[in-house]
Amino acid sequence: MTPYSIDKYASERYTIDYGRLYNIPTVAVRLFNVYGPRQNPNSEYSGVLSIVTKCLKENKPFTLYGDGSQTRDFVYVEDVVNALIKISTETNEPTVYNIANGDETSLIDVIHTYEEIVGIKLNIIKKEARQEDINKSRADVSKLKGIGFKPQWSLHDSLTNYWKYYSEN
């Protein structure tokens, strides 16, 4: 456990317990690897896909830590917004929802898909895997599915849309 994860967990518990204590409808959400238009690739909190996008557009090298087999549960920003709307209108249960697709995708597979979409080969600089990096990440989205939410954006379509936005701006 890291201080970051402990803080996130404590915030979730506070939100849920506050709602129960005062009978206020509250939920907490966990956003997994969100990407999409207007994401700032220069932020220290930026997701890997915004950094890859910037490197592709500016023909700059991308540093890949490890072999690229590490997985993430990527979710497009429009699906995040739709999930938040669904949660806010369909439930009063004080609980935690994971907002993601529920799929594991390796970083190297995402990079290859993106290269295919944009027609540019990413200049990759490989470095040793970082000890603190998570190797596998996949969200349990059963609660989200339980209120009728289903992601609308495939990885390919969302990356295509993201590239279109980023290349025009």
Can you say where each PLM-predicted feature lies in the sequence?
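Active-site Tyr-X1-5-Lys
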Residues: 1-27, 32, 56-58
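Amphipathic alpha-helical recognition patches that constitute DNA-binding helices
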Residues: 2, 30, 47, 51, ...
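C-terminal substrate-binding subdomain of Rossmann-fold SDR/epimerase-dehydratase oxidoreductases
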Residues: 56-169
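Hydrophobic alpha-helix immediately C-terminal to the catalytic Tyr-X-X-X-Lys motif of short-chain
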Residues: 10, 14, 18, 48, ...
